[in-house]
Amino acid sequence: MKTPTARTSGLFFTFALLLTACGGGANTGTNTTANTSATTNSSSAIPIGIAFAQTSNVALLGQEGVAGAKIAEKYFNDKGGINGTPIRLVFQDTGGDEAGAINAFQTLINQNRVFGIVGPTLSQQAFSANPIAERAKVPVIGASNTAKGIPQIGDYIARVSAPVSIVAPNSVKAALKINPNIKKVAVFYAQNDAFNKSETEIFQQTVKDQGLDLVTVQKFQTTDTDFQTQATNAINLKPDLVIISGLSADGGNLVRQLRELGYKGIIIGGNGLNTSSVLSVCKALCDGVLIAQAYSPDHPGEINNAFRTIYTNQYKKAPPQFSAQAFSAVQVYVEALKALDQKNKISQLPLPQLRTELNKQLLTGKYETPLGQIAFTPEGEVIQKEFYVAQIKMEQNGTNGKFAFLK
């Protein structure tokens, strides 16, 4: 178990700080700027980095995170920011691969000099980019990283996205409530993605724990579009349940092709399909897909009511999980910075010290977020109590749909 070290952040510099690059084991937390206060101008906004995918096949997920973060920025600034000082979110596109995430983190740390980072979009990216921030002693809060081992990357790594080991089994249990006669299960997963490899292990273990027969495990790539071979192989074994661990584009296409080939049973989608963007991929054939949830738009609570209202007014639909988690990650930084500033004026702290103190503060707090109340273990794992399962319900036009939450 890691010892919590302080996470500190400071106000946006009005002059350039000389920081070394974060790659190749360099430690940007120790350089000649250690005695420079975090700001020389109390009116400067507080920079928080947002590293989400805005391009590539992962953009369908990343854009939902961007939406939630932007809502949080305006919401908390309208409420006074950090004791009167506004926050300023600095966005960097991670793209869909590890190199993109590494570049985004390096830019946020070295050029933008952020106090902390929210991101990256994928767990696969986190395993490559988070060590950069860890060496630089820059706090990171994962908003959509659910694979096993994320908080264990280092002292400065936390997440508000509940681990797949807690969330995923709920959808299998829901499927068994809908059809208690399920016996045979086919599993599909994207073998080139760390999260999906982690998630499928949980799904496969859950299948065994429920006494079900795992008849086949089919592999694919997140970049694939043709699943005829894998789908046909699985359908020939007559499964009662299909479980898919993929992203929204590939996962949605797999759902569509399974239905087109005649599969009639229940389909479970993993966390990568937990976005309304999947509806435009499989359209009418998305109907009935089950997906476990770490967020419900109907969760009671003042801040979720506010978040849901703002999101719905802006996007004309209920907020998805990834937007709520991104909002919550920004909220954690805001509340931790406010608490820290009341102890020691953050504008007077050197940036390395500020990042360290911020890290320490955020790990000790409790937060009433759109996800419900959350907190963190000493090693940065989120503590969350409430989880859900939703079923996709498509309208007759085959274009519009929603996530209907099961009781």
Language-model regions: role of each:
Residues 2-4, 13-18, 22-407:
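Extracytosolic ligand-binding ectodomains
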